[in-house]
Amino acid sequence: VSSPKRIKKQITQELTEVKKKYATPRRTEIVYDHQSQTEAAPEDETPDYPVHLFLSHEGYLKKITPQSLRMASDQKYKDGDGPFLQWEANNRDDLLVFTDRQQCYKTRLSDFDDTKASVLGDDLPAKLGMDEGESVMGMVLPGDYSGYMIFFFENGKAAKVELSAYKTTSNRRRLTGAYSDKSPLKALLYLKEDREIAVYSTEPRVLIVNTALLGVKTTRTTQGVALLTLKKKYVLDTVRFPEETGITDLARYRGRSIPATGALLKTEDSDDKQLSLI
């Protein structure tokens, strides 16, 4: 075809036919090279400042600023309640709350109001929307999610799980299957690196071992490995750090391999007033 007019007419006809056939408007946007760079994520404008956290045995949490704590440090608790755990943290920090129902609740400290020592604090089960009768077993400030959790079960087993297994990309608040349900959970511990721990049974016996003996798992619901060999009718009771036990002869209770029975707790090494760190 040599005529420019005829060429233009042919193109016009073809475009008209295409328009009739594909009448739906464009659903995507043309992106040019200068637009292809990923836009920076919006900056977190949540105020960040140091805070002190106080958790009671019955699950009440207080977030108190250092200034407020200096003015009044005597903590108020309900009758029959008392101090369980406390940390120093920052307002933007994440918080993981583990319960007795194999669940983990993820929240941020900025979701909690600053309070004073003279109040009871937030009731965590109510604040986080826990199931009826669900109780707090422990809390963790995950930071960059390095390190690992260790779960200690009534049957003498312990499960060492990478903390990164609890990191989520979504805003999911509740994680189910946070740990194994094969035996009741007696204690949990968050460690950045391996160290010695003292494991107590109800006999009472004590076994002091290094957590390096526990193999690390990536599956949250792993049953763990046998740690404490138990006689019938006895169970794993609690876990402490050796320096907090009041035991004078630590060598008596040390084990080089697992599982092990530990040694009977001497009267002079028993201290009912010692608080578990877990």
Segments from the language model and where they lie:
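C-terminal interaction appendages of subunits in large macromolecular complexes
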Residues: 1-278
